[in-house]
Swiss-Prot record:
Gene source species: Caenorhabditis briggsae
Composition-biased stretches (Basic and acidic residues): 551-580
Keywords per UniProt: Cytoplasm, RNA-binding
Sequence ranges of Polar residues compositional bias: 427-439
Family listed: Belongs to the PAT1 family.
InterPro entries attached to this UniProt entry: Pat1-like (IPR039900)
Organism lineage string: Eukaryota, Metazoa, Ecdysozoa, Nematoda, Chromadorea
Protein name: Protein PAT1 homolog 1
Gene name linked to the record: patr-1
PANTHER family in the record: PROTEIN ASSOCIATED WITH TOPO II RELATED-1, ISOFORM A (PTHR21551:SF0), TOPOISOMERASE II-ASSOCIATED PROTEIN PAT1 (PTHR21551)
Function, in words: RNA-binding protein involved in deadenylation-dependent decapping of mRNAs, leading to the degradation of mRNAs. Acts as a scaffold protein that connects deadenylation and decapping machinery. Required for the recruitment of P-body components such as cgh-1 in somatic blastomeres. May play a role in recruiting the decapping enzyme dcap-1 to cytoplasmic puncta in the cell body of the posterior touch receptor neuron, PLM.
Length: 864
């Protein structure tokens, strides 16, 4: 501890060394810029390079400084020095004077005020009825208390004292006093005051700037120099711009020119002389010690409430660098009541935007910006302060939008940028209506009085529906309630690791359930994903349409059945109304008696000898039923007669096909060509007669199937293909109960005739198939169509055709049916084919690559 005290320094020594080092470096920097002896360590290492040797796209003397010598080298030197000073500034700006040798936190005995007692800068015009203030400042946690802060006020900290995050300074600490930065015409440099040397450091006035603000102001003025300023200073065309800029900084009674002159003499000290032997520069009269600064802060915090109630004087012009188009008449266009916000010196927020009445004339000449989300408007001052101070954003603040950098780079005025954003983002409905007031209004009918009178005795506040709409809790929760709710949510999310603490009631309930015999159900096994279907979208749409068609047919059948029941009930009702009540003896009118046991409740009936006469309705019903039966019988007889006629024609055609006709034949004198013409005439008549709507009926009749098979044997290959195609189309209208008989009667002849076709004729037959109709009938489990297609596959194998290529050419997908009906009838119908050929056919199907080939091959093997 003694060693620490030995090398320790007092607060006054450290503050003096820090101030002397920064000011000396600035004076040395200015001396090096305007003198010829530039330090070689800071010079550019590339001495041979000259920027005038580079090629430019334009030859603009005004832009590139034509006619000047060594301007490029001076610019490079300035940039190098600016970067060096910029790095030094930010390295020393955050120095904390909390050396462990100090045993007292401050040099004053008075207790510093609490963080919550320090006033926060006000927004708007300072009026309680201001629209901007009531809409945004009252509801934004960034303009009032914040749950993210670490202050020691009445509100608690949700993060706790042991969270491990360093304390974050409030948002007001990231802001700068822009009124003190901007050069003002009203600010005058005080003349030099000759004072006697004193051993004590004089106190600084309350209007003096701190060391950090002073250095930052000097840095801003340094980097704001342009190339033309250096030109004037080199050539001597105008007054010293640097001296004028330093005079605008209000450095007390110290003259900037005298500092520049004293800089070389001050820096010329012996190399071996220690730093403490150097004489410290005299502080100006306006300097302020740390004790006086703390007392000033305490006084301002105690009198802030009184100062807010008083009318503030008219502030100076807030636009230090107005954009083009501003006139001098606009300088005093602000509201008289608007003044600089009360707060800590050096930590002020950007000045509040002007009211809508005073801002209209100025904003008419500024470009209209895109509107900003109203929830982000309270963050604009924080963003601007972070950009100007080059500081990090507080915790929980969103990142800075890029357009703020562009606006500040263009206008060079944070207050103007803030006013433009507010003017562009406030909705028109939130702006005050009615006449515009140019000055303060006093009286019961003034806008302020109306805002105060708007609150009724029973209403909680003066906020409007627009204010509640911007509130995330719709105005139903206070700040304390929100803070408490968020804290509970954070605690719940964090968890303690103990189930009894995190979810006590559920743990107790689960224990009671287990005690009662409850056991956890095993998790259901995950269903295996279904294999990807090879069905195309066209097939899928066709299947859906077919399903819808079947549902429509079923619906029609249900409607038809309901209609029959309704008609039947109507006939029964009509008959019951006219028919008298009869006894059981009516049923046995022609019998000798009723065969029933006699009892007291049912004595033996006497025979009723009256003639039984049917009613007119019953007679009509009987007649209608008989007529229906007669009509059906008549149609059946007509069909049989037509079949008999077709059989006669087929017998004649078969007789004409014979090579040797008998002597009794009526066609014995005809030539072969004439016989062929007669055969074609008769077969065409049969095909035109039966290959229409009556074909499904013909397929369900044994005589009809006989006519079809005999016709296939007589006609030529072209007509055979027509008949086969017609049979496959009409099979969808045949009852499924008849599929077995149809396959056994027709399929053998179909196989025989298809096998005898020429490969070109077979190709024509396959190309003429209606694949959509075939797929639809296969989905309906039409066994006849399935067996016919399987027969075509068998014939194609016999013709040495590749099934896969043949399936691709015909665009046919699969022979698998949903019902997977066996191939027993197909094997019986093809009894002429041996089992060896069927087995070979099954192997060809299995390794053909056709869709569902393995399932079809398995069915073929099962048919053996």
């Amino acid at each position: 501890m003694d060693e620490v005290k030995k090398y320790g320094k007092t607060l006054e020594e450290i503050e003096g060394e820090l101030m002397f080092g920064k000011i000396s470096f600035m004076l040395f920097l200015f001396h090096c810029i305007f003198s010829d002896d530039f330090p070689e360590s800071l010079a550019d290492s590339d001495e041979e390079h000259n920027i005038f040797d580079d090629e430019f796209d334009a030859a603009n003397d005004e832009t590139f400084g034509g006619g000047l010598d060594n301007i490029g080298e001076n610019a490079e030197q300035v940039n190098c020095l600016v970067r060096a000073y910029h790095s030094l500034f930010f390295q020393t700006a955050r120095l904390r004077l909390d050396d462990p040798v100090w045993h007292h936190p401050s040099s004053s005995d008075q207790v510093a005020p609490d963080a919550s007692a320090i006033p926060f800068p006000t927004f708007g015009n300072g009026d309680s009825s201001d629209t901007f203030k009531s809409s945004f400042e009252a509801e934004s946690p960034f303009l009032k208390k914040s749950i993210w802060g670490n202050g020691a006020d009445s509100s608690f900290n949700i993060w706790g004292s042991d969270f491990g995050i360093a304390a974050v300074p409030p948002s007001s600490s990231f802001d700068l006093d822009y009124n003190s930065i901007a050069p003002n015409e009203a600010q005058q440099v005080s003349p030099l005051v000759q004072q006697k040397p004193s051993s004590q450091i004089p106190s600084m006035p309350s209007s003096a700037l701190t060391v950090t603000c002073l250095l930052y102001h000097e840095f801003l003025n340094l980097i704001s120099f342009k190339l033309e300023d250096f030109e004037r200073m080199q050539l001597g065309d105008s007054t010293d711009t640097l001296t004028a800029a330093l005079n605008d900084l209000q450095l007390g009674s110290t003259n900037a020119q005298s500092k520049i002159e004293q800089a070389p003499t001050t820096l010329q000290s012996a190399p071996g002389e220690p730093l403490k032997a150097q004489t410290l520069p005299k502080l100006p009269v306006s300097a302020l010690s740390l004790e006086e600064l703390e007392q000033k802060i305490i006084r301002e915090s105690q009198t802030v409430n009184v100062a807010n109630t008083q009318q503030t004087p008219q502030g100076s012009n807030r636009f230090a660098h107005p954009p083009p188009g501003f006139t001098a008449n606009m300088k005093n266009a602000q509201h008289p009541a608007m003044g600089p916000p009360m707060g800590m010196p050096g930590m002020q927020m950007p000045p509040p935007p002007m009211g809508y009445q005073q801002m209209g004339a100025i904003m008419q000449e500024l470009p209209r910006l895109p509107p900003l989300n109203p929830q982000y408007l309270p963050l604009v001052p924080i963003w601007l302060g972070a950009i100007v101070n080059n500081m990090q954003l507080p915790m929980g603040v969103p990142p800075i939008p890029p357009f703020l950098y562009q606006l500040l780079n263009h206008y060079r005025n944070p207050s103007l940028v803030h006013a433009m954003i507010v003017h562009s983002s406030i909705p028109p409905n939130s702006r005050p209506n009615g006449p515009q007031f140019s000055g303060p209004q006093v009286g019961p009918h003034s806008p302020g009085a109306r805002g105060q009178q708007r609150r009724n005795s029973g209403m909680p506040s003066t906020r409007t529906i627009y204010d509640l709409a911007l509130d995330s809790f719709a105005g139903y929760m206070s700040f304390k309630e929100r803070e408490w709710l968020i804290r509970i949510q954070f605690v719940q999310c964090k968890g303690s690791g103990d189930p009894c603490i995190d979810d006590y009631y559920y743990v107790r309930w689960r224990e009671s359930q287990i005690a009662n015999g409850w056991t956890a159900h095993p998790k259901p096994e995950s269903k295996q994903p279904l294999p990807a279907s090879s069905e195309s979208r066209k097939d899928y749409l066709e299947r859906i349409r077919r399903m819808n068609y079947r549902e429509m047919q079923k619906e029609r059948l249900r409607d038809r059945e309901k209609e029959r029941q309704r008609e039947r009930q109507e006939r029964i009702d009509r008959g019951e109304e006219r028919k008298p009540r009869q006894t059981l003896t009516d049923k046995f009118a022609t019998s000798l008696g009723l065969p029933s046991k006699s009892s007291t409740h049912n004595p033996r009936h006497v025979l009723d000898m009256k003639a039984q006469v049917d009613s007119v309705d019953n007679q009509a019903k009987k007649l209608s039923d008989e007529e229906r039966k007669n009509a059906v019988q008549k149609k059946l007889r007509t069909m049989l007669l037509r079949l008999e006629g077709a059989l006669v024609l087929l017998m004649e055609a078969e007789e004409l096909r014979r090579t040797s006709s008998s002597d009794k034949s009526q066609f014995k004198d005809l030539t072969s060509e004439e016989k062929e013409q007669e055969v074609e005439k008769r077969t065409s008549l049969i095909i035109d007669e039966f290959m229409g709507d009556d074909l499904p009926k013909l397929m369900q009749m044994s005589k009809g199937r006989a006519v079809l098979t005999r016709t296939l044997k007589v006609v030529g290959p072209r007509d055979q293909a027509r008949i086969i195609l017609s049979l496959m189309i009409a099979a969808g209208l045949v009852s499924k109960k008849m599929y077995g008989e149809i396959v056994l009667d027709i399929l053998p002849v179909v196989h025989q005739k298809v096998s005898n076709l020429h490969p070109d004729q077979f190709k024509y037959l396959v190309g003429a198939l209606n694949l959509d109709n075939i797929k639809r009938q296969l989905m309906d489990s039409n066994m006849f169509v399935r067996d016919v297609m399987l027969t075509l596959y068998l014939v194609s194998v016999k013709n040495n055709q590749n099934l896969l290529e043949w399936s691709k050419q015909t665009k046919f997908s699969s022979l698998k049916m949903p019902s997977s009906a066996p191939l027993g009838f197909w094997r019986k119908a093809l009894s002429a084919v041996t089992d060896a050929e069927i087995t070979e056919f099954a192997e060809d199907i299995k390794y053909s690559g056709v869709v569902d080939c393995h399932e079809v091959a398995k069915l073929i093997e099962q048919s053996l």
